[in-house]
Amino acid sequence: MKMKMIVVISILLIVFSLSSKAMSLEDEQESVQREEDDLLGFSEEDLKAIKEHRAKNAGRFDPAV
């Protein structure tokens, strides 16, 4: 019974460690992205507008627009 308890606790610690590592890598990636954006010289509003524009689906080409 003690062995099962040790195994379960070990597995939980490993899962927690991996999720913590993944979160820190995600934070680091966001930080690097912000630094790259800062180096480009775009303001936050410009970057937000660019990201929103990229997120829109490309519709049909309408020459009247």
UniProtKB/Swiss-Prot annotation:
Q: Which UniProt keywords apply?
A: Amidation, Secreted, Signal
User: What tissues is it present in?
Assistant: Expressed by the venom gland.
Q: Name the domain of life.
A: Eukaryota
Signal peptide bounds? 1-24
Q: Enumerate the propeptide ranges.
A: 25-34, 59-65
Detail the disulphide connectivity of this chain as listed in its UniProt entry. none
The yes or no answer to whether the keyword Metal-binding is present is: no
* A cellular component annotation (GO) from this entry: extracellular region
| Cellular localization per UniProt | Secreted
| Protein's recorded name | Peptide ToAcP
